[in-house]
């Protein structure tokens, strides 16, 4: 590992953020710290992850939602101090890494099938 990668790993460890495992197709709720004047509040942004970029400290992901009939996409830096928390609401079953095709779809064709836990995981959960 070179020096830059080592420094990035140390910085990620120092930030001490708990980021859940999520993938494209998952529905997530991103809590964002918003500063308005002298007030600071937390705003929830819920949508489908359409892209994920894994670059160590520079990692990011794009979340798409439909707001009052209009598609809205927002790109977040994974380790940004503006992100208060990330919560995975629903797992999506997709076969692509980038779901940009959802931009051209609306209604039922834009739905993503839910990924159900496999039978092996269910057996392990009941045994424990």
UniProtKB/Swiss-Prot annotation:
Keyword line: Ribonucleoprotein, Ribosomal protein
Name the species this protein comes from. Paracidovorax citrulli (strain AAC00-1)
Query: What are its GO biological-process terms?
Result: translation
Instruction: Give a Gene Ontology cellular component term annotated to this protein.
Output: cytosolic large ribosomal subunit
Q: Which Gene3D superfamilies match?
A: 2.30.30.790
Protein's UniProt name: Large ribosomal subunit protein bL19
Q: Where are the transmembrane segments?
A: none
Isomerase listed as a keyword: no
Q: Which family does it belong to?
A: Belongs to the bacterial ribosomal protein bL19 family.
Source domain of life is: Bacteria
InterPro entries linked to this entry: Ribosomal_bL19, Ribosomal_bL19_CS, Ribosomal_bL19_sf, Translation_prot_SH3-like_sf
Indicate whether Metal-binding appears among the record's keywords.
no
Role according to the record: This protein is located at the 30S-50S ribosomal subunit interface and may play a role in the structure and function of the aminoacyl-tRNA binding site.
**What is a single molecular function from GO for this protein?**
structural constituent of ribosome
């Amino acid at each position: 590992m070179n020096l830059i990668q080592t420094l990035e790993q140390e910085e990620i460890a120092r930030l001490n953020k708990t980021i859940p495992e999520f993938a494209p197709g998952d529905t997530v709720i991103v809590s964002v710290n918003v500063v308005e004047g002298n007030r600071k509040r937390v705003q929830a942004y819920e949508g489908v992850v359409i892209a994920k970029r894994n670059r160590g400290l520079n990692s990011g992901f794009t979340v798409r939602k439909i707001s009052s009939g209009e598609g809205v996409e927002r790109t977040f830096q994974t380790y940004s101090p503006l992100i208060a928390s990330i919560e995975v609401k629903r797992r999506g079953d997709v076969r692509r890494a980038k779901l940009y095709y959802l931009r051209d779809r609306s209604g039922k064709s834009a739905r993503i099938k839910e990924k159900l836990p496999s039978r092996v995981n269910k057996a392990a959960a009941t045994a424990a």
